[in-house]
Design a protein with these regions (language model features):
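Domain-level signature for soluble enzymes in the chorismate/prephenate branch of the shikimate pathway
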Residues: 1-202
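Single conserved hydrophobic/aromatic residue that forms the stacking wall/gate
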Residues: 197, 204-214
Length: 214
């Protein structure tokens, strides 16, 4: 039986179940092995303040190298630029929507402004790339760290002092989350003129399948 290594978030499990279903369709029996990564364990500080790399992948890669699991599923954007020696990417999913979504409380909307957000709005994101992009369009906004999985970050938007948060469209769509209670600005690089400032994370929307070398 093949062991599939995955993080335990709802989105990570969706991705693992999707691979599990594909393998079942060709007659492969599998089981999921949930692995906590450094990024899962440290939730109170931004990524730029955490030392090292592979925040959401290293522990899973270690399990592959030690043959505790047979295959891993990762969001491609979480993988380090350089592959770990002894590991390889065996396959990729079809690409989902690569856009970022600016998810705005309706009480904080100002359609006359570039981001459709009121002046001086507080936006939750822990991504340096996203912070630079947002402040390019509206220097008045304040970007503050927000951590957690997709449902957790939406709960923080509803219950804490944020006017908006940024999420990857692919994750929202995979989880089937209803965003009707919010105003949405989609940063789709296919439609926006200024590609430099609306570019998503490289490889966003792709899932990688990484096998053990054993």
């Amino acid at each position: 039986m093949l062991k599939i290594g995955t993080r335990g978030s709802k989105l990570a499990l969706w991705q693992a179940y999707d691979l599990q279903a594909q393998l079942k369709a060709i007659g492969e029996d599998t089981e999921l092995v949930i692995i906590k990564t450094k990024g899962d364990q440290i939730q109170d500080i931004g990524f730029d303040k955490i030392e090292g790399k592979g925040f959401f992948t290293k522990e899973i890669e270690d399990a592959l190298l030690s043959s505790d699991i047979d295959i891993a599923v990762h969001s491609m954007k979480d993988l380090p630029t350089e592959m770990v020696e002894g590991l390889s990417i065996a396959g990729l999913s079809s690409r989902a929507n690569p856009a970022d979504l600016l998810i705005i409380k309706k009480s904080s909307v100002d359609t006359s402004r570039a981001l459709k957000l009121k002046e001086g709005a507080k936006i939750g994101t822990s991504s340096i790339r996203r912070k630079v992009q947002l402040q390019h369009f509206d220097p008045s906004v304040e970007c503050v760290d927000v951590r957690g999985n997709v449902p957790t970050r939406l709960t923080k938007l509803d219950t804490q002092d944020y006017d908006a948060i940024v999420l990857a469209a692919a994750g929202v769509e995979r989880l089937g989350i209803d965003l009707d209670n919010y105003h949405i600005v989609e940063f789709n690089p296919k439609e926006y003129v200024c590609l430099l400032y609306t570019s998503p994370s490289p490889r966003d929307g792709l899932l990688s399948r990484m096998p053990s070398s054993a």
